[in-house]
């Protein structure tokens, strides 16, 4: 069994829980997710099965879309609704224009510091392990891409009796929406936290493409595997090169290929090699030999 499943991760489960359950449902060990979703977050979680696990990093690198509820006037230890209250401040009226100005400032490339309650590693240890022990450590900042921030709940003003707003966030890999909520609050002069979150898109998979674990289980019991998307879906944005049988034989052995073969994709960081409409391998320019490309991943194929 090889392919990608757009799973709808339900609230209350970890991403690892989903992998564990799918291994049992699909009767296979080769199952991997494409980026962690916190337990209290529901949403699109592409799962790679079989040979598709070789593509997990590329699927993970694609953009994401979230719908978040952000609450002003209160900050928490975890930057979301699960944490303990740290600070509170009564809201004076914040106009829609003031909020929009803050959103505009945070669109584009921004620098974030990961929250203490996160899986980022510092000195070989996950930040949440330090946090649970009551230890605060210096965290490395990271640059992330915010493609768009769109308010979804109209243009009403925010105040003490209406401290929350809905936001659609299109962003790149590694963005912490919790931290973005805090940053919006800081620009407006208030403590803030992310009170709810749903991931509505991950790479090329949308909410409407997804199935729950229960639905997948029912389909498997009916011998229906139509929930699997082909491997090629995971590399839709990657440059592609169609190869002939002679080249294919070299690719299967992990051979180096001449740069001249990649003329139409020469400015790309990598290219997906396609043989008989199937993904065969992913190649990239050789770091030392300018006249050669080398394999980054070779996907074995069963040829009929």
Curated annotation (Swiss-Prot):
<protein>
    <recommendedName>
        <fullName>tRNA pseudouridine synthase B</fullName>
        <ecNumber>5.4.99.25</ecNumber>
    </recommendedName>
</protein>
<feature type="active site" description="Nucleophile">
    <location>
        <position position="38"/>
    </location>
</feature>
<dbReference type="Pfam" id="PF16198">
    <property type="entry name" value="TruB_C_2"/>
</dbReference>
<comment type="function">
    <text>Responsible for synthesis of pseudouridine from uracil-55 in the psi GC loop of transfer RNAs.</text>
</comment>
<dbReference type="GO" id="GO:1990481">
    <property type="term" value="P:mRNA pseudouridine synthesis"/>
</dbReference>
<keyword id="KW-0819">tRNA processing</keyword>
<dbReference type="GO" id="GO:0160148">
    <property type="term" value="F:tRNA pseudouridine(55) synthase activity"/>
</dbReference>
<dbReference type="GO" id="GO:0006400">
    <property type="term" value="P:tRNA modification"/>
</dbReference>
<dbReference type="InterPro" id="IPR032819">
    <property type="entry name" value="TruB_C"/>
</dbReference>
<dbReference type="GO" id="GO:0031119">
    <property type="term" value="P:tRNA pseudouridine synthesis"/>
</dbReference>
<dbReference type="Pfam" id="PF01509">
    <property type="entry name" value="TruB_N"/>
</dbReference>
<keyword id="KW-0413">Isomerase</keyword>
<dbReference type="GO" id="GO:0003723">
    <property type="term" value="F:RNA binding"/>
</dbReference>
<dbReference type="InterPro" id="IPR002501">
    <property type="entry name" value="PsdUridine_synth_N"/>
</dbReference>
<dbReference type="InterPro" id="IPR014780">
    <property type="entry name" value="tRNA_psdUridine_synth_TruB"/>
</dbReference>
<dbReference type="InterPro" id="IPR020103">
    <property type="entry name" value="PsdUridine_synth_cat_dom_sf"/>
</dbReference>
<dbReference type="GO" id="GO:0009982">
    <property type="term" value="F:pseudouridine synthase activity"/>
</dbReference>
<comment type="similarity">
    <text>Belongs to the pseudouridine synthase TruB family. Type 1 subfamily.</text>
</comment>
